[in-house]
Amino acid sequence: MSQNKRVVITGMGALSPIGNDVKTTWENALKGVNGIDKITRIDTEPYSVHLAGELKNFNIEDHIDKKEARRMDRFTQYAIVAAREAVKDAQLDINDNTADRIGVWIGSGIGGMETFEIAHKQLMDKGPRRVSPFFVPMLIPDMATGQVSIDLGAKGPNGATVTACATGTNSIGEAFKIVQRGDADAMITGGTEAPITHMAIAGFSASRALSTNDDIETACRPFQEGRDGFVMGEGAGILVIESLESAQARGANIYAEIVGYGTTGDAYHITAPAPEGEGGSRAMQAAMDDAGIEPKDVQYLNAHGTSTPVGDLNEVKAIKNTFGEAAKHLKVSSTKSMTGHLLGATGGIEAIFSALSIKDSKVAPTIHAVTPDPECDLDIVPNEAQDLDITYAMSNSLGFGGHNAVLVFKKFEA
């Protein structure tokens, strides 16, 4: 059996509520910029939810031909834009000689929800003959991967993971394993989501998952007293990851190394986490075991931290159960306090934050931290970014259905 290959991050691309590229998104995260505001994409008057993290000043026609864009749902459009940025950042040349060894693995939690709404209205109002022939290709969650591979010409391993809010992290984890075992030299991977639609807001509201707070400064406040649900966000976070051998051969810039991946199932409830965060705790331990490290080795954890009453508390319990005494010295921040919850895309964005935290020795804060929940008594990096020398960082994603996914990143050393 061949030895596992080392896997490094060489490119990044982002669309988020706090920036339309990686540079802007990261700078605003370190500044503690709040990307949450009143929803403009749809009329929210009939709903109890009125806030979300929308993209700002973004026009898809600046990136994709209008005719082509009309044949894609927004979640696919976002993936293409972020993937192009990541590949350009990595200076990855996809050509006839390399295409078979470069794959794509991008997930979406809910896929083309807006496409579904439009097609359903056409069906009800005008009959089945008026439904677009592009309806199914626009709807299905794997189409972000499909369209990105077509757009970039990547012909290697190709797939899509759907694990609700753990989608982005699971996608990167699966791509990591593909490269680690030598099935590809590089993978374009992450998550994408465009959930700010009537049906998504109505559905998540009905499940009482969303915050009904209309104050943009307090609606999303992870680990704080009075938190009442998550605030939805949209965007995409895409990485180029590749074998160290490949990266060094072409002189690529390396942000960080991926060294561990853990994924588990709660087998407990369709939306609620297992008591005491048991499933999340096992995923964190599995990721550390995969990386060959102990809790004391980790300096920073980008928490799932969605600002739900039960979810935040259970994640804190999971962290304490996993890290023990080391939890007292761990920096734990929720960047969702700034971006909102990007569902399937959140793991991609937060992998970028984790890697850049290592590279720049800075940790983005948990903003809106003014009324701490005494039961969530971790160092959540309140309100202001902090300097921190990081060797290992971890990123948690926990999804409906009991999906738990964790990645471990390491400062790169040749």
Curated annotation (Swiss-Prot):
InterPro entries in alphabetical order: 3-oxoacyl-ACP_synth-2, Beta-ketoacyl_synthase, Ketoacyl_synth_AS, Ketoacyl_synth_C, Ketoacyl_synth_N, PKS_Beta-ketoAc_synthase_dom, Thiolase-like
EC number of this enzyme: 2.3.1.179
GO annotation, biological process: fatty acid biosynthetic process
SMART domains on file: PKS_KS (SM00825)
Pathway: Lipid metabolism; fatty acid biosynthesis
GO molecular function per UniProt: 3-oxoacyl-[acyl-carrier-protein] synthase activity
Residue numbers annotated as active site: 165 (for beta-ketoacyl synthase activity), 304 (for beta-ketoacyl synthase activity), 341 (for beta-ketoacyl synthase activity)
A Pfam family that the UniProt record links to this protein: ketoacyl-synt
Domain Ketosynthase family 3 (KS3): 4-411
Family in the record: Belongs to the thiolase-like superfamily. Beta-ketoacyl-ACP synthases family.
Record PANTHER family: 3-OXOACYL-[ACYL-CARRIER-PROTEIN] SYNTHASE, MITOCHONDRIAL, POLYKETIDE SYNTHASE-RELATED
Functional note: Involved in the type II fatty acid elongation cycle. Catalyzes the elongation of a wide range of acyl-ACP by the addition of two carbons from malonyl-ACP to an acyl acceptor. Can efficiently catalyze the conversion of palmitoleoyl-ACP (cis-hexadec-9-enoyl-ACP) to cis-vaccenoyl-ACP (cis-octadec-11-enoyl-ACP), an essential step in the thermal regulation of fatty acid composition.
Protein name: 3-oxoacyl-[acyl-carrier-protein] synthase 2
